[in-house]
Amino acid sequence: MRTVLTILLLAGSALSMSPSAQGRPAWLDPYRDNADKLIKAATADQFAWDRVAELTDTYGQRISGSDNLNRAIAWAVETMKKDGLENVHTERVMVPKWVRGAESLEITNPPHHVVPMLGLGGSIATPPAGIEAEVLVVGSGDELTKRAAEAKGKIVLFNVPYTNYGETVAYRSGGARMAAQHGAVAMLVRAVGPIGLRTPHTGNMNYGDDTVAKIPAAAIPVEDTLRIQRLTNRGIKVRLRLKMEAHFAPDVESLNVVGEIRGSEHPGEIVLIGCHFDSWDVGTGASDDGVGCIVGWEAARLMKQLSIRPKRTVRVVLFTNEENGMRGGNGYRDQHAEDAPNHIMAFESDSGVFAPARLAFTGSDAARKIVAEIGTLLAPLGLQEIGPGGGGADIGPIAMLGKVPMMSYSGDPTKYFTIHHTPADTVDRIEPAEVSKAAASIAAMIYVVADMPQALPK
């Protein structure tokens, strides 16, 4: 209790100091020079963007269990060592290996028309000859329930307009189970994204328990969904033929990649920077989450380059298997359970870097005040405002276990979710300056949190 009180008193004392001459908190004065150096170094060139391009151009899609991901992991280990990061190593986890296989969808009535589609991660296959059936278009789960008698033997298509990802993704993840409960033979979902470019969006789905039959599940573009809706509105019985070879192979070994800048005074206290290194198998995973990995990694690389060693350890973890299993984040929690309380803060970037970007924080009021004041150092980047809701899927497990404050860096959601889980998630969509800005803000924030005398209060 005495230690906790001491931390809180130190935090309160720091925050109550009089403002500096520049109108910024005086307690930050010792950190301004190094924070400015990190920001200037990060924004001096497009090194970070070039590294995202190297990763995604060279290794492409990186779905769990793939050779591409394994090669990318080996590259990351070698490159972290070349960067001078310390304690570079890998940590083993077993991950699912879902294989897409060949797939196709076509309208057979009215006259033949090929529909772009992507099977959803975790889906089963169709029979070898495919499934041909009439389609039932519904706009919600409630409508499906009301029209349950019509669903038996049909392919159910959820035409649910995008509102936000958290709401609309429920039909991608749970739509197959909803449709199967009413006797459907397959489920299709309108692409989960704000803008249609005739691009389907893949993503994980979940059958739940074994009380309901498993049926094939896929996503189709907004435009094709609307076309089928219009046809059915005219009383036309639209028939579709779906073929999918999707299946699970046995679980395989994968690796989380770890690199550090060891703390000068409190090496056992950890400021964690996380991201996921895997991606879906249809794009190159540039925004989801190649760029998130590189901008976090840059924080440590820049500290090493500038000979800045904070008091606490800065640990970068490139997590495996976020997209279709969360085995990387959960494995890290399990392997570091004893050290969970020693994690001072966990940071994640997994929502792109498209402008306008934002920083967000989740933690105690006392910690929030400190982080908000550190944010004043980011004024040159336009990121001084720290919003609520920081966190991430990969850092969540260790943060929940250790009651660890969380932060995140997020890009514009409309731009991000337009290409999310699509073949269009490529590095050319990203502006180099936006990558540099993200790296700069993360580096400066992490440096101060890792170097200030008191740990963030929990």
What are these regions, as identified by a protein language model?
Residues 5-16:
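Bacterial N-terminal signal peptides
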Residues 24-27, 31-34, 53, 57-155, ...:
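Noncatalytic luminal/extracellular "stalk/propeptide" segments of secretory-pathway proteins
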Residues 26-66, 199-202, 278, 349-354, ...:
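N-terminal capping segment at the start of a domain
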Residues 32-34, 108-110, 114-148, 205-286, ...:
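Soluble metallo-hydrolase cores and metallopeptidase-like ectodomains found primarily
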Residues 35-43, 57-67, 104, 122, ...:
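Second-shell loop/turn segments in exported
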Residues 50, 302-327, 346:
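Short helix-loop-beta-strand segments that form the rim/entrance of peptidase-like active sites
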Residues 113-114, 128, 133, 215-220, ...:
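Metal-dependent peptidase/peptidase-like ectodomains
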Residues 301, 305, 312, 417-458:
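His/Asp/Glu-rich mid-to-C-terminal helical/loop segments that flank catalytic regions of hydrolases
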